[in-house]
Amino acid sequence: SDGRNAAADDKASDLIGLAVRGCCSNPACSVNHPELCGRRR
């Protein structure tokens, strides 16, 4: 596997993780995206 691609994937998932945490701490966003915050209905 290509090390550069792995590093890019890690960076992307870090950014997604930050966005998800920001969304989950925002009630309006977490209500719209319960699957991101582990709140399954």
Curated annotation (Swiss-Prot):
InterPro entries per record: Conotoxin_a-typ
GO molecular function, one term: acetylcholine receptor inhibitor activity
Tissue/organ expression: Expressed by the venom duct.
Compartments in which it is found: Secreted
Propeptide: 1-21
Main localisation: secreted
Pfam families in alphabetical order: Toxin_8 (PF07365)
One Gene Ontology cellular component: host cell postsynaptic membrane
Swiss-Prot/TrEMBL keywords: Acetylcholine receptor inhibiting toxin, Amidation, Disulfide bond, Ion channel impairing toxin, Neurotoxin, Postsynaptic neurotoxin, Secreted, Toxin
Disulphide-bonded residues: 23-29, 24-37
Region (Ser-Xaa-Pro motif, crucial for potent interaction with nAChR): 25-27
In-chain residues carrying the UniProt-annotated modification Cysteine amide: 37
Domain notes: The cysteine framework is I (CC-C-C). Alpha4/7 pattern.
Similarity remark: Belongs to the conotoxin A superfamily.
Protein function: Alpha-conotoxins act on postsynaptic membranes, they bind to the nicotinic acetylcholine receptors (nAChR) and thus inhibit them.
Name of the featured protein: Alpha-conotoxin-like Qc1.5
Species assigned in the record: Conus quercinus (Oak cone)
